[in-house]
């Protein structure tokens, strides 16, 4: 089932998500729905808070990105970054902040501890686009949006677009959830 994606002004995007304690049929359904919703929106990453669920769960599928066509979808539960290497700046966007893009500095490689779709504990090394997408989605679990990480002068350049999103002026090809009473100031 395709879920609506919560937008910039929704308070669920500003909350720290709760860890998952176990896997069950509801979690499996949420994972499947998130993957379907992400693909429908032509995204490469999606965090549970973006679909209104405040849990530490992300899905990533880089197969839509050039050079990553063979990538398999990844489910990341309760992620924790163990280490980082070097930093670089790259333009990012977000399904919750449609049509807004900006440069963000992030580590270019990470070591990540997490649980997979089967709730098995994993430690993985990720670099380049995979590292960036995972960090972007982990930020969602911590109530941080990519625009919060932009340099102040760059953020000022997109403020009009953010204000428009806060007013509900949203044009996407995928379903969104807009909650007027949770506008971020």
UniProtKB/Swiss-Prot annotation:
Catalyzed reactions: N-terminal N-formyl-L-methionyl-[peptide] + H2O = N-terminal L-methionyl-[peptide] + formate
Keyword Translocase annotated: no
Free-text function comment from the UniProt entry: Removes the formyl group from the N-terminal Met of newly synthesized proteins. Requires at least a dipeptide for an efficient rate of reaction. N-terminal L-methionine is a prerequisite for activity but the enzyme has broad specificity at other positions.
Cofactor entry: Fe(2+)
NCBIfam families: pept_deformyl (TIGR00079), PRK00150.1-3 (NF001159)
Family, as annotated: Belongs to the polypeptide deformylase family.
EC number of the protein: 3.5.1.88
Residues annotated as catalytic: 137
Catalytic class of the enzyme: hydrolase
Keywords: Hydrolase, Iron, Metal-binding, Protein biosynthesis
Cofactor binding, per record: Binds 1 Fe(2+) ion.
Underlying gene: def
CDD domains given in the database record: Pep_deformylase
Binding site for Fe cation: 94, 136, 140
Pfam families: Pep_deformylase
GO molecular function: metal ion binding; peptide deformylase activity
Any one GO biological process: co-translational protein modification
Name assigned to this protein: Peptide deformylase
């Amino acid at each position: 089932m395709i879920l609506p994606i919560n937008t910039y002004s929704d308070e669920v995007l500003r909350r720290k998500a709760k860890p998952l304690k176990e896997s069950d049929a509801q979690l499996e359904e949420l994972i499947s729905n998130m993957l379907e919703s992400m693909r429908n929106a032509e995204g490469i990453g999606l965090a549970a808070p973006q679909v209104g669920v405040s849990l530490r769960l992300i899905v990533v599928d880089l197969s839509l990105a050039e050079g990553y066509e063979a990538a398999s979808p990844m489910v990341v539960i309760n992620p924790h970054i163990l280490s980082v290497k070097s930093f670089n700046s790259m333009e990012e966007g977000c399904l919750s902040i449609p049509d807004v893009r900006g440069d963000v500095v992030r580590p270019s490689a990470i070591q990540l501890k997490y649980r997979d779709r089967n709730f098995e504990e994993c430690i993985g090394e990720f670099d380049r686009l995979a590292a960036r997408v995972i960090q972007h989605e982990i930020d969602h679990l911590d109530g941080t949006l990519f625009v919060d990480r932009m340099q102040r002068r760059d953020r000022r350049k997109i403020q009009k677009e953010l204000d428009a999103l806060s007013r509900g002026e949203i044009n996407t090809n995928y379903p969104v959830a807009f909650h007027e009473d949770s506008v971020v100031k």
